[in-house]
Amino acid sequence: SREIPSTDGKQPQKQATADLVKIDIVNPSGGEKEPVFQTVGQQLISEDVFRVLTPAAPDSIKAMIARGDAMQPTISDGDLIWVDVSIKTPTSDGLYLFALKGEVFVKRLRLDNFNHSAAIISDNPLYPPIGISKPDKLSTLGKVISVTKIYR
């Protein structure tokens, strides 16, 4: 809450305000040795809304703008993707941010624990899956926790 000064000589009034969480909006790119997250802006959201998304610390969450059509219809070009960058080891199927061959991208991961393998899958059927024989060697940069659809 914050105090609003009185203009009539009375006591200042308290006004309830939502606590805000600041999330970096980043542009991920494949670096020579490690991917780079260049901060291009910030998004303010209420702490209450943030806690609905995740119990993670705010500095573990990065937002980024989706590019391309490989994950349509789940993620469209221009959507805002929220990623928990503290999750580096996938333990379940889901959407993850990966680095592979100098590229950074979001894909669906399907783990096959029985065969100790995995598949990186685009939701758009025009893009074939990528088989991974050693999923523990994947360069996982984080797990997608939410997608904000941007309608244009």
Predicted segments with their positions:
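Short, positionally conserved secondary-structure boundary motifs
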Residues: S1-D77, K149-R152
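Acidic/glycine-rich C-terminal interaction modules and beta/coil loop segments
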Residues: E32, R51-R152
